[in-house]
Amino acid sequence: MRNKGLIIIFMLLCVLPSEARKRHIVNISHEYQSVVVNEDSTVTFCYCGMGKRVSVYGDFFYAGEDSTRYTDLRSKRVKMKRESDGCFHATTRPIQSEVYTYCFKVNGKRKNDPLNNDTAWQMTHKWNIVTVGGTAQTALYQQPAQRGTMLHTSWYSSAEKLNRRVNIYLPAGYSDTLRYPVLYLLHGISGYEGSWSERGRAIQILENLVAQGKCQPMILVMPDVNVKPQEGTPTHRSLFNNIMNYSRLCHDHDIERALVELTAFVDSTFRVSDDHYIAGLSDGARMAANTANLLPNYFSAVGLFSPVVHKEQLPKDSATYYVYSGKKDMFHANAIRFNRRLDKAQAPHEYTETIGGHTWRNWRLYLSDYMIKINQ
């Protein structure tokens, strides 16, 4: 009987993964935090899964090296070190107050943080999100006491003969006796209807501005403006197909016609005042300008963030255009040319130039500034 027990133990040892047969046996049953923002504005990452080589990569290391250095759609990878608890750890330098994205790489394969449900899609990948406080920007990302309501719904596009998804935010205390300004926010070529609320933090920005008395309560409308509307949760393939259909997006105005129908849907369904605004980032800025021209005198202001716009997008009414661009933005020259055309056309507009590039950290700042200006 004793020999039989020894045989069973030997067989179990043989089938254990090689990693577990070594000294480093990872006890993933104990409680741990995968990401911690420390008091000195450093961030510590922890990964306790199986693996020999683990790295963390994201857009936060660049900001720690140089407070004015920004990157366009690139991330830096840093190796994590296995410590006495059997888990892998890495800590950044002190970094700025911002919303950062990160992901793990385990044995050469990309892996999201399983303990962090705060995620967002960017290009064709899902990223985890960590928010760092500590400066004046913190107020943009703190959670106020009163929160509004997010509705996930759809509207019918007769031009395309299909339903398009849209997220609609109603402010805290939404009342049947009041009417509210409405702001339409359009994502870029690789986004979807959740981009502005997830990566853009549009709701937190608005609610904090309201709490600070810099903005009145507003309805936010964030539609899916992809060439082919997403079915279910975005995937690598669906977002990639949208990017590949970019040429069609630039020449097919069915999406803008669908947005015109969206305004009618919103006006008839919610308590909207006569104050209508629209803004978009990157190619969403082009769609915002086109939609404004399809609805002359409907929008009081148009926000163009890192815009991909041309002379045909010049305004056809008296709406004020707010153009924003970073000096390192890939479309910076385009924004400058469009601003000159606005000057020549004597159209009411403001141009704001910042450091940085084609990044969400800039678009969040642009949105905050735009919201404040349209409420003045």
Regions found by a protein language model. Give the residues of each.
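Hydrophobic h-region of N-terminal signal peptides that target proteins for export
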Residues: 10-18
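Aromatic-rich carbohydrate-binding modules that target alpha-glucans
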Residues: 35-97, 105-135
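N-terminal cap/lid segment of alpha/beta-hydrolase-fold proteins
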Residues: 47-49, 82, 124-175
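Short beta-strand segments enriched for Tyr within beta-sheet-rich domains
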Residues: 56, 98-106, 168, 180, ...
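Short substrate-entry loop that stabilizes the transition state in hydrolases
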Residues: 174-180, 185-233
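Alpha/beta-hydrolase active-site loop
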Residues: 240-269
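Primarily recognizes the serine-hydrolase "nucleophile elbow" in alpha/beta-hydrolase
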Residues: 261, 265-267, 272-317
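C-terminal catalytic histidine-bearing segment of alpha/beta-hydrolase fold enzymes
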Residues: 320-324, 328-376
